[in-house]
Swiss-Prot record:
Official protein name in the record: Monothiol glutaredoxin-S6
Organism expressing this protein natively: Oryza sativa subsp. japonica
Annotated [2Fe-2S] cluster binding sites: C51
Compartment(s) of residence: Cytoplasm
UniProt-listed Pfam families: Glutaredoxin
Amino acid sequence: MAAARAAVPIAVFLLLVLAEADPAAATRSPSAFVQNAIYSNRITIFSKTYCPYSMRAKRIFRDLKENPYIVELDLREDGREIQSVLLDLVGRHTVPQVFVNGQHVGGSDDTANAHSNGQLQKLLGNSQSQR
């Protein structure tokens, strides 16, 4: 009987360890994907291919000769889940959502305003800041 009681905590411990043993599962989560996309890339744009506002944000970076990491949510099976993560993270469910050096810039209008007032260039670290 004592051996059986001792085996229960060991079995519980092993279940907990094995449940956490798959780090790949954590990186497959939409939340982990979003965090990795934001912090592993200088510029990240969460976009949809058909969205004119997303096209505008991408055009701004193209005009600046920048090459952002673009996540096209409508082309991903987990696009809706990623959009829900963005809602939790920045309080917006719309696209585009633009991040520069880990900092949330905002949507299309926010990005255009940051570009026109020089804030975007400052975030990018470009010396050609417009004033």
